[in-house]
Amino acid sequence: MAAVAAATRWHLLLVLSAAGLGVTGAPQPPNILLLLMDDMGWGDLGVYGEPSRETPNLDRMAAEGMLFPSFYAANPLCSPSRAALLTGRLPIRTGFYTTNGHARNAYTPQEIVGGIPDPEHLLPELLKGAGYASKIVGKWHLGHRPQFHPLKHGFDEWFGSPNCHFGPYDNRARPNIPVYRDWEMVGRFYEEFPINLKTGESNLTQIYLQEALDFIKRQQATHHPFFLYWAIDATHAPVYASRAFLGTSQRGRYGDAVREIDDSVGRIVGLLRDLKIAGNTFVFFTSDNGAALVSAPKQGGSNGPFLCGKQTTFEGGMREPAIAWWPGHIPAGQVSHQLGSVMDLFTTSLSLAGLEPPSDRAIDGLDLLPAMLQGRLTERPIFYYRGNTLMAATLGQYKAHFWTWTNSWEEFRQGVDFCPGQNVSGVTTHSQEEHTKLPLIFHLGRDPGERFPLSFASTEYLDALRKITLVVQQHQESLVPGQPQLNVCNPAVMNWAPPGCEKLGKCLTPPESVPEKCSWPH
């Protein structure tokens, strides 16, 4: 590993030197664009086999860059996965989990009291050490209260929202969610930023696109490196698209949203080419978790051959589309079978900037540059957590399930189904089933749909079990969980009076403060 890292650093030094020198003669590190989608599935892109082939720009990105077919979210739900991307650490370490029930998914609704803890070092904070200017466009989702604001955690600019575009609300029992520019709100969803739930029309993706284009143009003129985290939420239900894209897809409204995203990515990449900075800009496209099959077929995407979707620790819940693009550096048209994670984007971005990850804490993200630049593969596990429960682990081609659960029988009988049409006897369960003594093990190469567990008596099973058990033991013995952030809710902390509401005349009166345990049903 040391030799690989040294070789990668040497290669990167040559790359940076070739990319351009600043006035002092020091090489300038590349710009970094992380494009994070919301609830987009592995099977939603043409390059991943989506039959309508309506993503020409993303497909071209893959043809000019590198595809990662085995790339994972850090959690099957939005907030924990986003915290992991920006810290390089599993959500169990940063406190993005709940202990209010066994194996419960949790996130950051308006009433959540917690958020990203101050001791965590976020990627934009660290990139400042290499002179990067940074902006987040879109969904933050790491806490609503003022102390969790993204500009307090390293970002220089923000246009977007602390949550998804849920609503509309009546502003009495629950306020509509604010949209911020930097420190202050500039309106609310369904008010200044309309979304027509009947037609699906909203101009939000175009607004987010323009924010990205304007930032890139401004930063290019400064000749300093920049970091853009473009975290839009268009494919999260309720799905929306602008008028020009509505009705243009063979896949309905969800496909319209995907087409608009594809067009937006094409325009961003086109601008990089026009400004002649494509060769000095690293771009990575992925999603925060699997497609929400519970919203399908009209409001949910495709997870391809994989089982179930968002909220579950089956492959469909956590395996993501992933494309790396860096012309002249990442060889074109390549497929990497490196097991990757959104946490790797933290470590890889630091490596691109010539920085080391913090040494005072466990970092779970790998540097993907050896895989991207040299085709080298690093063996590493993928851990699948639901709350503070380790549900499964993958090593190589083998995945072991220690617990299985989709969602409760009560919810299922009410029509909530995270695996519609995909029931696998003994695998997809509506009660929490423990397999810690004899895990269910699947070979994901032969059986990506997790339908045929290996025989407990087979040599293949025993060999895979031995290797995975060792890795899991090492992980659990050294694990120091963070203080849980997603246990306490309080209606008084919702977005009643965000900063800037006075200027707009949009301050609302909060209710009495009543802290209580958050209820997480699945």
UniProtKB/Swiss-Prot annotation:
Family: Belongs to the sulfatase family.
Protein name per its UniProtKB record: N-acetylgalactosamine-6-sulfatase
Post-translational modification: The conversion to 3-oxoalanine (also known as C-formylglycine, FGly), of a serine or cysteine residue in prokaryotes and of a cysteine residue in eukaryotes, is critical for catalytic activity.
Reaction catalyzed: Hydrolysis of the 6-sulfate groups of the N-acetyl-D-galactosamine 6-sulfate units of chondroitin sulfate and of the D-galactose 6-sulfate units of keratan sulfate
PROSITE patterns reported for this sequence: SULFATASE_1 (PS00523), SULFATASE_2 (PS00149)
Comment on bound cofactor: Binds 1 Ca(2+) ion per subunit.
Species per Swiss-Prot/TrEMBL record: Sus scrofa
UniProt modified residues of type 3-oxoalanine (Cys): C78
Glycosylation sites: N203, N423
Binding residues annotated for Ca(2+), in chain numbering: D38, D39, C78, D288, N289
Covalent S-S links between cysteines: C308-C419, C489-C518, C501-C507
Pfam family, one: Sulfatase
